[in-house]
Structures are given as structure tokens and as C-alpha cells.
Amino acid sequence: MTPDETLSAVRAALEAYVDPYLGETLGAAQAVREVSATGAGLSAQVVLGFATGGYQPELANALGRHLAAAGIEAPLAIELQSDIKAHAVQRNLKPLGDIRNVVAVASGKGGVGKSTVAVNLALAWTAQGARVGILDADIYGPSQPLMLGLVGQRPTSPDGKHLRPLVSHGVSAMSIGFLVDAEQPMVWRGPMVTQALTQLLGETQWGELDYLVVDMPPGTGDIQLTLAQRVPVAGAVIVTTPQDIALADARKGLKMFEKVSVPVLGIVENMSVHVCSSCGHTEHIFGAGGGERMAREYGVRLLGELPLDAHIREEADGGRPTVVAAPDSPRARPYLEMARRTGAALALRARDRSALFPKIVVEET
């Protein structure tokens, strides 16, 4: 083959590779940008629409094997880049200024570990190179101040109107828990709660973010409705455990987001398997396969199956969640993979095109 024919064959082979996180070929994702020959072999630039930190060695090895299977044996150097775009939100709403994507983490039932999933998702995206914030929308029972090691700290206001978020482990955070005493109960009616959420979101100086993770309260009440009607959400993640009682409520949460035209990115099955802290024995104490069955039932992705491990609880309670406390541990890997799958699921959604169209102003004469 001529050099040009070789490069064309390499590009075709690369574009035929099915990325495990996207679930589609690199060609369909328009991810292969440049293919060239170098003195040492071949070079390819791959651009993906999700945070890719730490993924380059895995992808390079997989693509090398893929090319070898196609009969192309030349050494391959992969330049992997991330290009996170703003994605479409509910009709009649526009993305929030410098925040490209708002991702709601929700559950129909309390006690399934949703806040632990939300904070580790935010931290995993940060570790993978994204700019991330987290909004604790559980006004009645905020958990993020404790999990992020920020209990007792207060945000400042540069102008008396806006708040600067607190920063922990590289994540910008805002919570009602930063503004009230830790032991003060929030005895508020629905309108006060929804107003508080709106202010926390709109009056915080988030800066430029690729993702804003919203840690939702359990259920399908006022806060969820406010989020759907007033906040431009690019996608939702539903957290459940494998047991039937949790799955029943998770289904309600999923249907609620569908009803208000918020796309569901997928299901996270938390507490999927119990890991004994003494011997490492694993056991499905809450059942097995519930999250996978639910994902299949509703035609969405299973984003992750996360372990029930005493270390995860201890690390979150200590203000250093697992992704930060033990990033190379076996218990952290499912969180990192879950974050990559979630980012990839969002990357496949329709992009926001509003910035491409001029504003039309109708003046009366």
C-alpha cells in the first residue's frame, strides 16, 4: 500500500473501534481527528466528549490490539483530548451561563447512598480533568458539608448579593448546610425550600464548569418539580440498590424525569455487593441484578455497580470520599468508571445550539 492508503486504512480501522464507554464506534462519535505517519510509526488524535484523564493508556492499548487484529502492526501513538460541550436541556430553558451541563443525581427513596454517589461522581470527574461543582439540593438534610470536610465553614460574599462557593478537593460546593448551624432543623414549607434552592443555584458565583452535579433529596416533591421547571438540566442519574423496595421508588423517580422532559442518563446500582472489611469475601446481601433489569426495562444504561464497603462509609464521614482517599484502590475503580460512563452517556446527547442563533427582538412601531 502507498503511504496515503496506509493512513486511510488506519483511520478506517480506528473509526471502526467501539469505545466501551460510549458504546458506539469512534467514527460515529466523530472522535478520530488526525492520523499521520511519524518516524516512530503512526500517530492519531482522538477527541472525546467526556473527561478523559487517566484513560489514555487504556485506550492506546485497546486501539493497538484493534489495529493488530486488522493486520496493521505499526506502533501507534495516541493523543487523547477531551472536548466537553454544553448539551440540550428542557424546552424553554437555556443553559446556565458558564455552566455547561447540570446533572441531577436522584433517587426515589432515601437511604440508598445517593449523596455518596453524587460526591464521588463530582470528585471522579475532577480527577479526570473536568471543572466540576456540586450543589447540595437536599435542603432538609444536607450531607455534602460533612462528606467534603467543610463542616463549620462559611462562604463569603464579594458584593453582598452573591456567594463564592467553598472548594474541597478541587470541587466547588454550595449547600444550605454552609449557611445554618449543623444541628439547626430546616422547618420550612415547600415554597421556602424551592426559593432556597433557586437562590443557592442562581446567586452562587460558580465560574466556568463543565459539570454541576446536583445532589437531589429523595422523592418526587417540590424540589424535584422546581428543578425540572426552572433549572436547565442536561441529564439525570438514578441511584438505587438491588432490592425490590428501592427499585420500585427508583422507577417513580425515573418516570418523573421522563415526564418533565429531562433525559435519564442511566442507573447506578449502589450497594451492589457487600465486601467484608476483614477477609474481602463478597456477598449480594440486597439481591443481585436489580439495577441491570431496571436499565433494560427502561432502555437506559447501567452506569455502574458500586460496592457496599465499610471503608467507603468511613472515608465519606471523614471528609475524604473514596475517590480522593484511595484513588488507586479496587473500591474506587467502580466510581471512576461510573463517572466515565456518565460523561460518555451525556456526550451522546444532543448539544445545545442556542449560541449559534442570533437573538430576535420584535419592536413595536
Regions from the PLM with identified roles:
Residues P57, N61-L63, W206, D210-Y211, ...:
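Conserved catalytic-core segment of NTP-binding enzymes
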Residues G111-N120, P142-S143, M216-Q224, A246-D249:
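Short glycine/serine/threonine-rich phosphate/pyrophosphate-binding segments
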Residues W125, A130-W188, T194-Q195, L201:
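Phosphate-binding loop that captures ATP/GTP phosphates
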Residues M174, M216, Q229, E337:
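Glycine-rich phosphate-binding loops of nucleotide-dependent enzymes
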Residues G318-S329:
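C-terminal boundary of histidine-terminating zinc-finger modules
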